[in-house]
């Protein structure tokens, strides 16, 4: 039996009665954002809009981005990352469950010293992939060139934000590299592991 998105009571300051809002809208009001799906243009635009709005509303209060994502599209993910770097409030990133592929890229993009993983979380990095199978040869070559540029961008960010040498990141991105929360901390993707 699907229950949909749960609703919770919320009382607007100055109002007599509470109104029922979905749990995510209630949490957004507390500056708690969630990426609990594959990264695509829709979720990217929603998160970007929320971060910009929250930054305008109060640029001194921190934002928390909870991540449980198998990854997703590179360009929408990079747009979220760029917004995290652009907004004035510090963005904490918290991995719960899985931060794979673009999810791990967003995790490492949090404010350095404020990136956290839950104790049983998993993190995975790898290189960007393309699904451009039915293309003409010329289009395929252009796609491959674009993929190499994107890989270079992602690699540069991982190097900058983890402190790992370029050759280590490049080598590790050749395949799927899964890490425990402690491994991700040692790698520099997160700064802290929550205690059990």
UniProtKB/Swiss-Prot annotation:
The keyword Membrane does not apply. Keywords: Hydrolase, Plastid, Protease, Serine protease. InterPro entries: ClpP, ClpP/crotonase-like_dom_sf, ClpP/TepA, ClpP_His_AS, ClpP_Ser_AS. Its EC number is 3.4.21.92. GO terms for cellular component: endopeptidase Clp complex; plastid stroma. The active site is at residues 101, 126. The keyword ATP-binding does not apply. GO terms for biological process: protein quality control for misfolded or incompletely synthesized proteins. PROSITE patterns: CLP_PROTEASE_HIS (PS00382), CLP_PROTEASE_SER (PS00381). It is found in: Plastid. It catalyses: Hydrolysis of proteins to small peptides in the presence of ATP and magnesium. alpha-casein is the usual test substrate. In the absence of ATP, only oligopeptides shorter than five residues are hydrolyzed (such as succinyl-Leu-Tyr-|-NHMec, and Leu-Tyr-Leu-|-Tyr-Trp, in which cleavage of the -Tyr-|-Leu- and -Tyr-|-Trp bonds also occurs). One of its GO terms (molecular function) is ATP-dependent peptidase activity. It comes from the Eukaryota. It holds the Pfam family CLP_protease. Component of the chloroplastic Clp protease core complex. Belongs to the peptidase S14 family. HAMAP family: ClpP. Cleaves peptides in various proteins in a process that requires ATP hydrolysis. Has a chymotrypsin-like activity. Plays a major role in the degradation of misfolded proteins. This is ATP-dependent Clp protease proteolytic subunit. It comes from Epifagus virginiana (Beechdrops). The gene is clpP.
């Amino acid at each position: 039996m699907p229950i949909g998105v749960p609703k919770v009571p919320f009382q607007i300051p100055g109002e007599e009665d509470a109104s029922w809002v979905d749990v995510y809208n209630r949490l957004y009001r507390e500056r708690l954002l969630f990426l609990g799906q594959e990264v695509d243009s829709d979720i990217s635009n929603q998160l970007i809009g929320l971060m910009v709005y929250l930054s305008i509303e109060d640029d001194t209060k921190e934002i928390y981005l909870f991540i449980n994502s198998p990854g997703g599209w590179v360009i929408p993910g990079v747009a979220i990352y760029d917004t995290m770097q652009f907004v004035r409030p510090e963005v904490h990133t918290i991995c719960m469950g899985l931060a794979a592929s673009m999810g791990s890229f967003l995790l490492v993009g949090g404010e350095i010293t404020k990136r956290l993983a839950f104790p049983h979380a998993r993190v995975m990095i790898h290189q960007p992939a393309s699904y451009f199978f039915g293309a003409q040869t010329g289009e395929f070559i252009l796609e491959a060139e674009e993929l190499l540029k994107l890989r270079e961008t992602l690699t540069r960010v991982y190097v900058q934000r983890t402190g790992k040498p370029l050759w280590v990141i490049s080598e590790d991105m050749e395949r799927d590299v899964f890490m425990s929360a402690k491994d991700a901390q040692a790698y520099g993707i997160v700064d802290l592991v929550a205690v059990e």
